[in-house]
Amino acid sequence: RQMCIRDRWNMGWMNDLCHYLKMDPYFRQYHHKDVTFSMVYAFSERFVLPISHDEVVHGKGSLLNKMPGDYNQKFAGLRTFMGYMMTHPGKKLLFMGCEFGQFIEWDYHKQLDWMLLDYESHRKTKDYIRALNHYYLAHPALWQVEDNWDGFRWLNADDNTRSVITYYRADEKGKKSLVLCNFAASRWEDYRMGVPEAGTYRVALCSEEEQYG
């Protein structure tokens, strides 16, 4: 008998991103490559993007508590991270409790803190992750082509001063989903981004909608 393991955990992506997300948003402009470098090697192997139990134990803090800022900024950071993770090439691995913003580290001696869902911010986070999962499943652009550049293109990877990245994912028929991730603590009014084709575009999902944050 033999076991064939096809996919590999992308530890480089995870380490770079965790380092970036823990940082004060002002200083992220000087470490912009932490969120872009993974695309240099994204298609060299079949990767899984892992947020595993190892990342939320042993003093590393829960995913929510890795985020800097006040209470609301932590939840906003978590939603931005999840949007980036779900639209980045690679299979996804998210450890239990991260989907509703558990504050404490995972403890195998007890169950998750389900009572947090009685609080609005945690409940809205769960609703956002649900909506994000539904969007992911309904749009093959986010998962159909994950092994070459036909499925991903940067629109702007260099806006480090505003800590913004824009890109699109494409399915086998060329249908695209455009993505904008703002890792700053600021809102950018009238932000201009490039698009691959002329036309009318609509916002399909936004982590800052009132129902989510």
Which residue ranges define each predicted feature?
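Short, small-residue-biased leader/transition segments that mark boundaries at the very start
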Residues: R1-I5
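Transcription/chromatin regulatory elements, primarily intrinsically disordered
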Residues: D34-S38
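Carbohydrate-interacting/catalytic domains
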Residues: Y26-Y30, E45-F47, D54, G59-L94, ...
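Acidic (Asp/Glu)-rich catalytic clusters
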Residues: M39-S44
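Acidic, His- and aromatic-enriched active-site or binding-groove loops in soluble protein domains
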Residues: D7-M23
